[in-house]
Regions:
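Bacterial Sec-dependent signal peptides at the C-terminal "C-region" and cleavage site
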Residues: 16-22
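Bacterial N-terminal signal peptides
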Residues: 6-15
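N-terminal accessory beta-strand-rich subdomains and adjacent acidic, glycine-rich linkers
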Residues: 22-200
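Positively charged n-region of N-terminal signal peptides that target proteins for export
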Residues: 1-5
Length: 200
């Protein structure tokens, strides 16, 4: 009976974990879809009904043996996640810059914050003869926060205060952008000592 109930719950819960959360821009043209697929944070982006970004993963690779979370085994923030919490909100303000070509700038977006949980168990340390030691359970949380504007999106990673992710170094950001076409990309050079570089 217990096995049958567990199977039924699995069949109910599994499709829910695969369902994507849809967030639209204020005018509805930009559509973000976010889900956790096989433990990996994944998003897509559409504009006016056409795909712009195909399914792309998000995550961070941590530098090995560099963070000081006590008793923490090395594990990057790439996979093994479940969706723990979702929050959506709308923000709309108009502000005036001190200098620039535009007098009023409107900051209007819909926001979506996904709190992700990463859980695992580590092997117990070796005890004295006859001593039984239990596996240690670990849990970490990160937040991926999206802002969906009428002309695009932005996102960032946030790290709530927690013992399992207390101090760490990020070796590489693994945010993916699987563009749906052969697009032209614009970026700023990585010269962090000056702001005089032109956008390329």
């Amino acid at each position: 009976m217990k096995t049958g109930l567990q199977l039924l719950l699995s069949l109910i819960v599994a499709p829910l974990t695969m369902m994507a959360t849809e967030v639209k821009s204020p005018n509805g043209n930009v559509v973000l879809n976010f889900t956790v697929e096989d433990g990996r944070p994944t998003y897509t982006l559409d504009y006016k009904g056409k795909a712009v970004v195909l399914p792309s993963h998000l995550g961070l690779e941590l530098a090995k043996d560099k963070h000081a979370s006590m008793g923490m085994e090395e594990r990057s923030l790439l996979e093994g996640f479940t969706l723990a919490k979702e929050e959506t909100s709308e923000f709309d303000e108009t502000w005036q810059p001190v200098w620039g070509e535009t007098r009023d700038i409107r900051n209007h977006y819909n926001e979506y914050a996904a709190t992700l949980s990463q859980e695992w168990q580590s092997a117990p340390p070796k005890g004295t003869r006859g001593q039984r030691l239990a596996f240690r359970r670990h849990e970490r949380h990160i937040i991926i926060r999206f802002r969906v504007y009428d002309d695009g999106i932005g996102f960032r990673y946030e790290f709530p205060q927690q013992t399992e992710l207390n101090y760490f170094l990020i070796q590489e950001e693994k945010s993916e952008f699987a563009m749906a076409g052969d697009h032209t990309a614009w970026w700023l050079p990585g010269d962090y000592d000056t702001q005089e570089q032109e956008t390329q």
